[in-house]
Each structure stands twice: as structure tokens, then as C-alpha cells.
Amino acid sequence: MLTSILIKGRTPVLASRNLLAALSNCNHITWAVSRRLYNDGNRDQRNFGRNQRNNNSNRYRNSRFNSRPRTRSREDDDEVHFDKTTFSKLIHVPKEDNSKEVTLDSLLEEGVLDKEIHKAITRMEFPGLTPVQQKTIKPILSSEDHDVIARAKTGTGKTFAFLIPIFQHLINTKFDSQYMVKAVIVAPTRDLALQIEAEVKKIHDMNYGLKKYACVSLVGGTDFRAAMNKMNKLRPNIVIATPGRLIDVLEKYSNKFFRFVDYKVLDEADRLLEIGFRDDLETISGILNEKNSKSADNIKTLLFSATLDDKVQKLANNIMNKKECLFLDTVDKNEPEAHERIDQSVVISEKFANSIFAAVEHIKKQIKERDSNYKAIIFAPTVKFTSFLCSILKNEFKKDLPILEFHGKITQNKRTSLVKRFKKDESGILVCTDVGARGMDFPNVHEVLQIGVPSELANYIHRIGRTARSGKEGSSVLFICKDELPFVRELEDAKNIVIAKQEKYEPSEEIKSEVLEAVTEEPEDISDIVISLISSYRSCIKEYRFSERRILPEIASTYGVLLNDPQLKIPVSRRFLDKLGLSRSPIGKAMFEIRDYSSRDGNNKSYDYDDDSEISFRGNKNYNNRSQNRDYDDEPFRRSNNNRRSFSRSNDKNNYSSRNSNIY
């Protein structure tokens, strides 16, 4: 049978199955079979230079919705379909073949684990290996001739599922290249990378004999020279890094530290791709393979991901070196994706602003019932709204328990300090954006509260996954207005998550007065906060099937409610309204009061919101992550002309060519 294929994304040719099989064994970076089925025009020709990695010009920009992934059905999420034309070496391990109960003791008896790592993990007094750990540790260590892809829910112990095999490998090779990096772990965010480093230190603390296998984190927002001094001093065997900083180090010091890498781990691979790191990950893999002293295909790759869509599969095919790749699926298709131990509920108000009152009243009740022994995380849609909520909660509850603000605009040192503090505290409230939604492991969180909807459907699952960790129970409360109810239906349709507990809420005059007294922001600041929310929600309209004419005016009405005058509208200039594409829309007139001036209160702050402001709309995935001032991988910000936020209008009225950094 003849099959049409593409070599290096160029001219189609006809080939037999034998030729296809031969091509599949070629170097994946050099030969790309059927690559153009998934990629944009010029991405097939790889180049390790940064200019090529930053080339993102061929992405579609005509509609803000073109770049948004379609909502997947429940059947799509349950059954992972691999395209054999691009991933022919995959071996799908049936769940029934990998369902035998595994314990640390059994792994020790079988000779899979050394007594030193067994001692360290046992001293942590875990109740037992989690299902993810049971299904992955032994297959990872059983052979050096295959890579591994593992699909697992959030909060299921993925970190130790790859740390235990890494330490076992270091023990097995302790006399080989003792002072070289042997394992590289790539994480999507600084905070997750530092958290993985903290887990490594726990293993060190439980068995001092393992401290000789040193670990160093390489993340943005920290001093590069200090990190290199630490690398020279410790000569680590394990490096945990974010992609941008890792590439910086590899380009300068790959020969010095990274010639003996045996393991490469991608944690939260789907999130890495979601943020825009695909080219960086392929570059990292290419450099590590090229510099490896043993062979270009020596490195074993472990890829952990909550979802395995076409993009994740494509990445796996491009970066995995071994002849075989095991796929281990630890997700039961009969279970919903949200953790089964989480008690979920939704509180529905008439107005968006009432969700703020409802959340404050709920927290007051919990503090009273728990005698101030209350630990919760509150998620908010944008940075400005997060800061606003934190201010209100501090004015309300600072005498009862600590209130912490956490988002990407905070410096890395402060973020690290906040994470350590909240992990240690028995009580407190962490107010954050989605930067804290994935991978962060905070112990003993009683509740996750959400005011408004997340930027993406999957983030609801990752948000609530911050509670009910390590076998404990927890609860989640979603505070929304009636116009946000389509989000709840979308959760049920697309993710099989049914929130049975639903209650309506109407604030009393007492709680409204109490909260409004805690509002200290000026009207201009309130308008900025509400406009950031409008930006957020406008980007979600199509995905969640919101009614634009209802949801946007409802969000805008929050301005008047917070200023204790429901009739007030947000004052903006006509020029600003033009930028939003709403100057002739009835919706714009319902939301804003047009004032023809460009400055206020005698200062330089303008209602026009110039191009360097943070009012571009969120949700556009067509951005180049390496050139943005981002809150994930965090090398020092390099401003360039293409980094300016553009309000270019299209027929869709919502086409913005850069991503809103205000949401994280």
C-alpha cells in the first residue's frame, strides 16, 4: 500500500510501509514524518539559535478564537489516541497488566530499589505508594532501553514517581561521572521547580547518605552568576530548571556540566506546551543529545502530563530517543478528572459583585466554626483583582489569620518566601492567580475558593487540586453570578464534573456595608480592576458559551457596586473605547461612560490606557513566550518592539497580538 508522506515538511511523496518503518527509526530532529499535519509553516527546520526559536510569525492572528483549543469531549479525555504515523514506537501498557499492588518493601525485595532510597522514603512515613507511583516506578527502572509517558491526575504523587527512579539510577551509577549532571528536570514555573527541589531536600534530610547526590535549581528571577557559582561548588547530579534559564546555561556551560546526562524529565508537559515552550523543549533536548558523551540517543526521557493531546504526542515524538516508549495511563476513565475526595459546591448570586460578599461571609463563617484554624486558597481571574481581594481580606481578617498575596508580578524572592511560609503555617489564606493552580503542594489546605471562572476549563481541575492532597479530604467552593452558569454546564459536558451542591446567595445589607468599608481603593483604581476583569471574561465568552451582551455589562456593573452607587459606569475616553472595538456597540454604551479627556486628577495616568498598559485581552495563545514578560519561565525581561501590546482590530473586534500578562 502506498502512503503519502512529507519529509522535512516539504514535497509530498509516495512510499511503501517499509519505507515508513525505516523513516520512523531515523533521528526525529532530522526526519519528520507527516510533520506538516500538525505544525505551522516554518517550524520544521530546527535551529538552536534564539532568533529561530522566537519566530512565531506564521501563527493565525485573524481571530482570537483560532488559537483556542477546542473543548474536548469526555470520550476524548478518557481514551488517549496516538497517531502511529508520528509515534510508531509507542507501547501501550494495558492497565490490567500494571494493576498489581506495589509497595516499597516489595520493590526492595525484588531488587528494584536500593536500601538507601528505601530508608529515606520509609522515614517520611507515607501511608504507602500512590497509584501513580505504583504504576510507574518499576517500569521506569526495569530497562534503560525505553522512554516513559505517564498520564496522571493532579495531586497524585507524580513528583516522587520520577524522583525515586532518579535517585536509584544515581545509586546504580555512583562511581561513574560522580561530579556531573545526570538528571535534568524541566518544570513550567519557577515555583514548581523550587518545590521539586524542596522534595529532593526532604529525601536528603531523611538519609544523609544521599546528600552526596546534590541538586541545584536554575530558574529565572534569580541571580545567574550566583547559580553558576553554586553549580561549580556543588557539582550537582540533579538539575531542576525552567526552560528559559536552562537554555541560557546550556548555551554557555553544556560542555562543563551536561555531557553525562542519563535522565530527562518533563513535569507538567501539557502546561509547558500551553505556555509556549515547545521550541525551547526541543532545543533543550537537541543540545543535551548533541553534547552527550555516550551517544545521541543515550538520554532516557520521562514525560508526565495530565492530558495527552496531539501537541503533547508531537513533542514526545520529537524529543524521545529510545526505540520504545511505554505509555502508562493511571487515569480511570470511569472517574471524573477532579479528585474524588473533594467536596465541591457552587454559590450563585444575581450579580458578580455579590460573589465578593459571599466569599467574605463564607470565610467569616469558617473562621468562627474552626476557631481560626482555617487554611484556604482563593483564586481570582486577574492580578489586579487578586491584589484588590487581598486588600479587602486583610482589612477584614488580619487579626484572625495571615493573608498572603501570590501572583506573577511579585518578585521571585518574595514568592519563594510566601510559598515557604504558607506551607509551614497551620492557618491562613493565600490569595492568588492561576500561577498557583498547578504543581504547587501546600499541606493541609481545608478549602479552595474561586471567585469567578478560570481562564481555561482545565484550570478548574488544577485549582481544586490544591486541596485533598496526600490522601486527605478537602472542599471547593465556586462563587459565580447567574450569567456565569454556562461554565458549570461546560464542566459537566466536557469534563464529566457534576457539582451537585448549588445554592443561591443574596447579601445582607450588613455584609455589604462591612465589605464596602474595607474597600480603600480610589475610583480610578477600581476602574482598572474592573476593566481587567472585563478583559478576562471577554476572552472566555466563546469557550464557556457566555452571552456577551449579559456577562460583560454584569462585570462592568461591579464598578458602581464597589463605589456604593450601582448607577455609576466606568469612565473612559472614546479613544480607549475605540481600541476595545466597542465604541459603536450597545454593549459598550451599557458598560462605560464616555468622557473626552485624557488625564485625571492632575497626574499622568490616562483613561486612554496607552499601548504599554495591561489592558489587552487575555486568552490569546498566539504569543511567543520567550519574548514576553512572563510569570512562568522567568529569565530577565528583554523588551523589544514586538513586545508592545497591540490593539489591532479585526472583524472579530477582539484580535490582540500579544498576551495579557495581567492575568497571572
Curated annotation (Swiss-Prot):
GO cellular component: mitochondrial matrix; mitochondrial ribosome; mitochondrion
Domain of life per record: Eukaryota
Compositionally biased tracts (Polar residues): 653-664
Biased composition (Low complexity): 48-68, 639-649
Pfam family membership, one: DEAD
Cellular localisation: Mitochondrion matrix
Known EC number: 3.6.4.13
Extra remark beyond the main annotation: Present with 10300 molecules/cell in log phase SD medium.
Name by which UniProt lists this protein: ATP-dependent RNA helicase MSS116, mitochondrial
